[in-house]
Structures are given as C-alpha cells and as structure tokens.
C-alpha cells in the first residue's frame, strides 16, 4: 500500500529509510517550535497559542505535501518572515498582530493566484538572479541583527543632541529627550543572560563545525538546561513535561483582514508574497533536485506546481490558525541527505510536529538566550549565497547591495526589496543595457515608486 501511494520502489527507497529521513528532517527543524513562540510573543501573541498554530499548521501542511505532491519536504513558519512580522510590521509600524495575520492571509491568496496562473513564471523568470540571491542574503543579515539584539550581544545606545539638557531644564523635566543618533554597540558582557547567549552561540557553532545532525535543536536544549542549572531561569511550580493542548488559548480565526486592507498594507503584503514566492521556489527546486525528483538541466520539475500550491495554501492556513507565514523549509535537505525520496518522509515529519502539540509546558521553559543564537546562525547560513552575486558588474552588484544593506539597517524586508526593484532597471537603462531587463521589472519598479510617492 505504501509503495503504491509513495512510489517507493520507483524512487529506490524503503519504508525504513523514509521514516528515518523524516525523523532527521524533524530533528534539524524542531528548533522552530521554540523559536516561533519566543519571536511572536514579542508581538503580543500568547506563546501557547503560537506553539499550537506552529505544530498544527506545520504538521498538517507537511503531511499534505507528502500525500498530495509526494515530495520529501517539510513546512513550518519561516524564520525571516517571523522576524519581519514581529519587528517590522507589528513593533515597527504599530500594526496589531491580528491585522498582521490578515496581511499574511491575503499574501497567501495572492501567492496562490500567482501559482495557479502564468504570472508566477513571469515573475520568477523576470526577476534577475542577483536580486533573488540578494533577498536571501538581506534576510539573513536582518534576522542576524535581531538575534544579536535579543541575545543582548548587541545593544542600541542613544546619543542625545547637545542642547537636550537645556531643553529639559526649561520644561522642568517634562520633556522627553530627543535622540539625535541611535548607535549599535556591543552588549553588556557582564550580564548572565548575555553570557548564556554567547555560550549558546559558540556551542552551537562548534556542533555545526562538527556537522552534527540537529545542531540547532541540541544547542537550544543544552542552553535551556544550563540556564536552569545556573539559576538564570527558575522552574515554574507544578511543572509537567506533557499536557493536553489548551485550544481555548489558540488564536484560531483571530486575523483581521478588513483592517489589513483598510490600512493600505500593500507594501507589506507585497513583501510577504515576494519572499514567499522565491523562498518556496528555491527550496522546492533545490530539494527536489537533491532528491533526484527534478532535473534542472532538462527543465523537468514534476509536481512543482502542486508543491507551490500546497505551500501557498499553507501560508493562508497558518494565518487562520494564528501563526506567521508557513513555507517550505530548507532543512528538508537534511532528510533528503539521509535518503528521503518520497512524501513518506514529509508525512513522518508532519506526524512528529503534531505530537509536539502536547509539549507546551516544555516550550514555555526555553529562554530567549537559547533561541536568539539560532537567528544569528541561520542568518550566517543564508549569507553564504552572496558568492553568487556578480559584484564586478555594477549594474548587478549595486542593486543587490542596496537590497542587502537596507533590509537590516532599516529593519524592513520591504524597503530592501523596493530599493533593489528601482535601482536595477534604472542602472541598466543608464548603462545602455535596458534590453537585459524583463518588462515585469519595469512594472514592479513603477508600482514601488507610486507606493512611496503617494502612500
């Protein structure tokens, strides 16, 4: 039965190999069960609610990928978009988390429309490779800075203008001092929490240097244990490892779609969709090629359209359940490396995610010092793609540079993408190489300019 459903013999694998591959994938990406609640709680969401949405959404969508597409690919809330959701949209723009979920839901529908039509192919072909790579690298730097800040390894110090003291005296101390500069500085290395995060970062990096499977998860677990052993964290009373999930805390259907439309979050929705599209496409093609399901040289990608459809539905489903963008995880490559070739690998991973619904008490124990280094390391991994950008060609390198630096330093994925979309066609025109630019890039550039001028 399983052989017929998943084509095990045809793809040269077995039930045992597929299950072990599914377990391997789960181990390498299980850190998201600790990371997502910690990041989204900063946006005002309940940790237990986020865990339920992450485990349930990731589990169901991953199982769907296995059953309907037969790809060994797992899905869960994407790290970069978790950070974008919390730090840019909610904390940066002052949007409620319900409205932000509404924007995620809409982006999923847009992604689905793009996937089901030829527009997807136009965008994928029309966006230059340097821009696609730059988006990945920029998001990597973005989440690394967030990880450094959350860990305490980096601090933001405020420099006051010279006449601030006089203004405060004149207003009898009632003036809120204006800041002339906000500087990124080294954090307080005398803080126990900061030192714990530093230990976690170094320990996890050493594990990865040894190529130990599940390094990120091991790092989170060991750091959490150290936190309680050293007294930096205290165990809650009446603690139990397992508990029946409290669905009354879940954020099911708490998204606010009308507000997302009314507030004109077009750029935010566009950014979510843009990143979803290229993250999904890159991960699916890369993993399917590694699993020998697809052949990029011949252009054969059987099931790619169906896989992207499941991914797109997963985005909106995640928002309905109460979590940020659910997308294909690059960690799926670990399962493929362990021999995974079919959807049985994904189904195994999905079932393990569902089992984790009962681990809410355990997740609540994990401190920021254990999860923030994960952001730094994932960012470092994403940075490796920069080698594929041709910086010798100014018309390719400079737009990519703008994307990369503006994402972290303006705390916005949207700003980085927008700058690149404007700069790329502009430089090509000035260089007399306008024919190298696909028409879709001109359309996107005009839309971005209109957004910044009129909205």
Name each model-derived stretch.
Residues 38-49, 88-99, 263-266, 367, ...:
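Helix-coil boundary and interhelical linker segments in multi-pass alpha-helical membrane proteins
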Residues 44-63:
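Loop-to-helix transition at the N-terminal end of transmembrane alpha-helices
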Residues 93-222, 347-455:
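Membrane-embedded alpha-helical modules
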Residues 58-79, 110:
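Juxtamembrane transmembrane-helix boundary signature
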Residues 2-32, 36, 57, 78-87, ...:
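Helix-loop-helix junctions within the multi-pass membrane cores of secondary transporters/permeases
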Residues 34-38, 54, 62, 83, ...:
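Transmembrane alpha-helix boundary and packing residues in multipass membrane permease domains
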Residues 1-50, 182-186, 218-305, 446-450:
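Helix-loop-helix hairpins and the membrane-proximal interhelical loops
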Residues 23-30, 60-63, 67, 144, ...:
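Hydrophobic/aromatic residues within the transmembrane alpha-helices of Major Facilitator Superfamily
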């Amino acid at each position: 039965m399983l052989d017929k459903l998943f084509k095990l013999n045809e793809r040269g694998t077995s039930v045992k190999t597929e299950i072990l591959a599914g377990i391997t994938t789960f181990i390498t990406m299980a850190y998201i069960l600790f990371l997502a609640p910690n990041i989204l709680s900063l946006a005002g969401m309940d940790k237990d609610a986020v865990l339920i949405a992450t485990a349930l959404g990731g589990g169901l969508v991953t199982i769907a990928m296995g059953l309907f597409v037969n790809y060994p690919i797992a899905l869960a809330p994407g790290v970069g978009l978790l950070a974008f959701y919390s730090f840019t949209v909610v904390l940066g723009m002052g949007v409620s988390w319900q409205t932000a979920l509404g924007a995620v839901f809409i982006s999923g529908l847009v992604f689905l429309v793009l996937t089901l039509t030829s527009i997807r192919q136009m965008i994928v072909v029309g966006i230059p490779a340097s821009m696609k790579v730059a988006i990945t690298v920029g998001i990597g730097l973005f989440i690394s800075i967030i990880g450094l800040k959350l860990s305490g390894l980096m601090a933001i110090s405020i420099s006051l203008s010279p006449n601030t003291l006089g203004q405060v005296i004149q207003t009898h101390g009632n003036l809120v001092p204006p800041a002339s500069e906000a500087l990124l500085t080294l954090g307080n290395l005398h803080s126990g929490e900061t030192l714990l995060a530093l230990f976690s970062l170094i320990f996890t990096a050493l594990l990865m240097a040894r190529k130990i499977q599940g390094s990120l998860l091991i790092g989170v677990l060991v750091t959490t244990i150290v936190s309680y052993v050293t007294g930096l964290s205290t165990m809650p009373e009446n603690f139990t490892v397992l508990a029946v999930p409290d669905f009354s805390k879940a954020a099911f259907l708490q998204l606010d779609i009308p507000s997302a439309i009314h507030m004109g979050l077009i750029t935010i929705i566009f950014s979510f969709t843009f990143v979803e599209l290229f993250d999904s496409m890159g991960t699916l093609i890369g993993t399917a090629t590694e699993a020998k399901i697809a052949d990029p040289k011949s252009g054969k990608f059987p099931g790619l359209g169906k896989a992207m459809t499941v991914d797109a539905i997963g985005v909106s489903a995640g928002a309905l359940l109460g979590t940020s963008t659910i997308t294909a995880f690059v960690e799926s490559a670990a399962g493929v490396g362990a021999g995974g070739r079919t959807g049985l690998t994904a189904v195994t991973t999905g079932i393990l995610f569902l089992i984790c619904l009962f681990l809410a008490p355990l997740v609540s124990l994990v401190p920021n010092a254990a999860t923030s280094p994960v952001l730094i390391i994932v960012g470092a991994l994403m940075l490796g793609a920069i080698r594929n950008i041709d910086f010798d060609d100014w018309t390719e390198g400079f737009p990519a540079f703008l994307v990369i630096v503006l994402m972290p330093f303006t705390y916005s994925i949207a700003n980085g993408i927008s700058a690149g979309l404007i700069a790329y066609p502009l430089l090509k025109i000035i260089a007399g190489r306008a024919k190298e630019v696909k028409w879709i890039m001109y359309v996107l550039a005009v839309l971005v300019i209109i957004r910044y001028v009129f909205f």
